[in-house]
Amino acid sequence: MKRGKTRKTDEMFSNYIRTRDEWECLACAKSKDYSNNRQGLHCSHYWSRSRENTRFDTQNCISLCTYHHLYGWGHGDGRNEYTAFMIKRLGQEGFDKLDVRAHLTKKQDDKLDKIAINELMKEVQ
């Protein structure tokens, strides 16, 4: 899987997603507190970060532990589980709309993305 270059806004958005999801892996629903172990909990993008239009889309991202992000849901049959989870979370119509957004093009705009992410963080603080 091709990974997009990490930017400062990626770090900000990742922190927002993990805070929104209360620092828990949504796949295994463990109540383990990852707030002191940021490396153990990842911001997983259903559609890759290389797709600029959904890179900072809150419906495209969830918190996953290292296992589910790198081994469980990211590969083979696990991808089917990830898809089923996303459809359940967003509904079929919401998932289909996310799919459409993922296939549109968007020019990178870090300044605008940073403003939008700061506004999102206000909602969870």
What kind of region is each of these model predictions?
Residues 1-12, 123-125:
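Arg/Lys-rich, low-complexity, intrinsically disordered N-terminal tails that contact nucleic acids
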Residues 8-42, 65-68:
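Short cysteine-rich loop/turn motifs with clustered Cys
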Residues 95-125:
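Short flanking/linker segments adjacent to small metal-binding domains or redox-active Cys/His motifs
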Residues 35-46, 73-79:
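Short Cys/His-rich "knuckle" micro-motifs
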